[in-house]
């Protein structure tokens, strides 16, 4: 893999990290997304972040959270309001990528969400995230999953 491609992947990974933090903050505070984004950009070194992708993830996940929740509810084993805030933010981001970014293989979406959960979540939350998003991928990307298996 070329250094340029590696840098692009790393920039997207960093965008996801900042986005999940912003989504979490929005869930807890309901502060306007533009304020969360502006403060994040001022307070952090963002020169190696895919800023366009960060902006898209943060704004679109928040704007579409009700629709994303509708996708998630059938594959959850508990009520939405019983989820940990980090888990919910990570699941919403993963659901958005599964639904709206078909160019990203579903396994990459799952792997990235698992890494976010390991970094920000509780001890075993990555296992829960994996299970939920795998079930969602079966619904949203059935053909891709069948082809991969």
Curated annotation (Swiss-Prot):
Q: Which domain of life is it from?
A: Bacteria
Give the signal peptide range: none
InterPro entries tied to this protein: NusB-like_sf (IPR035926), NusB_fam (IPR011605), NusB_RsmB_TIM44 (IPR006027)
Q: Name one GO cellular component term.
A: cytosol
Its Gene Ontology biological processes? Answer: DNA-templated transcription termination; transcription antitermination
Ordered alphabetically, the record's keywords are:
RNA-binding, Transcription, Transcription antitermination, Transcription regulation
Q: Recorded GO terms, molecular function?
A: RNA binding
Q: Family per UniProt? A: Belongs to the NusB family.
Q: What does this protein do?
A: Involved in transcription antitermination. Required for transcription of ribosomal RNA (rRNA) genes. Binds specifically to the boxA antiterminator sequence of the ribosomal RNA (rrn) operons.
What protein does this entry describe?
A: Transcription antitermination protein NusB
